[in-house]
Amino acid sequence: MINAGELRKNTKLMIEGEPYVMLEVQFVKPGKGVAFYKCKMRNLMTGSLLERTYRSGDTFEPAALEEKKMQYLYAQGDEYYFMDVKTYDQVMLTEEAVGDAKEYLIDNLEMDILFFENKAIGITLPNFVELEVTQADPWVKGDSVAGDSKPVTLQTGMVLQVPPFVEEGTIIQVDTRTGAYVTRVKK
């Protein structure tokens, strides 16, 4: 069982028989009364949001989710296809289930696919991915007017703020948790 004090972002638990993932957990200690946790979570089956408050003594059942290592294959319309790296079985996820992770999906990227009752319901990206810069404005050395970052377009279509020395064709590392530039990748 999970105690309310152990709730953190990305904690997966069962509420009313359905799996949820915590998006935000805020500890509130009012001047009078009992302290509580204000929680915002997403239903992993339907994608709907739920906001609830819980007391410190409340307990929860951990979500019975299975994670399988899979590889991204391709997208067709709003369907995304993945392959199990051990059995070569393929699964399909909708654009809704993939969510913002679609900004990081490149061919052959390995990640964990979440399964609930043998049904694929979501993905867990690796913390860092390497993406190629496909469009970047040129940088003039000594140009301090432009500031310390510039927008570039990555191979997935994502637009990201990067340091001015990053050029078109450069491979960069991006943190999938924050969506921020990390470093250039030397190949």
Swiss-Prot record:
The protein depicted here goes by the name Elongation factor P
The entry assigns this protein to a family as follows: Belongs to the elongation factor P family.
Keyword Secreted part of the UniProt annotation: no
Gene3D superfamilies attached to this UniProt entry: 2.30.30.30, Nucleic acid-binding proteins
The reply to whether Heme figures as a keyword in the UniProt entry is: no
> Gene encoding this chain?
efp
Example of a GO MF term = translation elongation factor activity
Q: Which GO terms describe its biological process?
A: peptide biosynthetic process
**Its domain of life?**
Bacteria
Query: Which Pfam family is an annotated match for this chain, by its short name?
Result: EFP_N
Instruction: Report keywords, A-Z.
Output: Cytoplasm, Elongation factor, Protein biosynthesis
